[in-house]
Regions:
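Short, small/acidic-rich helices and loops at N termini and domain boundaries
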Residues: 1-47, 51, 82, 101, ...
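Pre-Walker A adenine-sensing motif
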Residues: 59-67
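Cytosolic-facing regulatory segments adjacent to core modules
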Residues: 63, 90, 94-181, 195
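Pre-Walker A (Motif I) flank of P-loop NTPase domains
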Residues: 70-74
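P-loop (Walker A) phosphate-binding loop of NTP-binding proteins
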Residues: 79
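Hydrophobic positions on the alpha1 helix immediately C-terminal to the Walker A/P-loop
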Residues: 87
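Conserved small/polar residues in nucleotide/adenosyl-binding loops
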Residues: 198-207
Length: 208
């Protein structure tokens, strides 16, 4: 099964690269690289903005990182039940709703319905305990209705398939990227991802 997944992923990657006609440049001299780097500096200066990547909505964090940059790998770490998923979903909401950016979420623990309920409570400022017990107050309904409209328009794509491998996630993210130009991919959470030791050994062999 690992070999099949690997072959499918490699074939999909090849097709994707052909479709985009993206050819590697190989070695490039500094005389060609430096002008591009300087041009980027000029563009960043002209923007007059501190956030050059994907803003999270957390001001201090955004100022420290200038936003999540393309190819960044960000890991949220903490003890169990400390709010890692809630923090990640707040970042997802900000990126999709405020920044208008397509976001992919691979949820290996919670179902997509559970995540949607969490986000509705967050956006609508409704106590999640009242949602769970069904003891909603009259003032909660307009807030939930407003939150439903906002969340429905957000370009958030959730996959709660259990046991997704790294190869499967990469293939799905690649397809979504080609269709919606993804700006952020979130995985909740890493320890639940199955590890293909055959695939790891193949990478070790290539590295050696």
């Amino acid at each position: 099964q690992d070999d099949i997944d690997s072959l499918v992923d490699e074939a999909e990657q090849t097709i994707f690269e052909i479709a985009r006609s993206k050819k590697g440049e190989g070695f490039v001299p500094m005389s060609s690289i430096v002008p591009r780097a300087f041009e980027r500096i000029e563009k960043l200066f002209e923007r007059k903005e501190h956030i050059t990547g994907v803003a999270t909505g957390f001001t201090d964090l955004d100022h420290m990182t200038a936003g999540f940059q393309p190819s960044d790998l960000i890991i949220l770490a903490g003890r169990p039940s400390m709010g890692k998923t809630a923090l990640a979903m707040n970042m997802v909401q900000h990126a999709a709703i405020v920044e208008k950016m397509p976001v992919a979420v691979f949820s290996l623990e919670m179902s997509m319905d559970q995540l949607a309920l969490r986000m509705l409570c967050s956006i609508g400022r409704v106590d999640s305990q009242r949602i769970r017990t069904g003891r909603l107050k009259k003032r909660d309904w307009p807030n939930l209705t407003r939150a439903t409209g906002i969340l429905s328009d957000a370009r958030i794509f959730i996959d709660d398939s259990a046991g997704l491998s790294v190869l499967e996630m990469r293939a799905k993210a690649r397809r979504l990227k080609s269709e919606h130009d993804l700006g952020l991919v979130v995985i909740d959470y890493l320890q639940l991802m199955p590890v293909s030791y055959t695939h790891l050994r193949a990478h070790e062999t290539k590295a050696n």
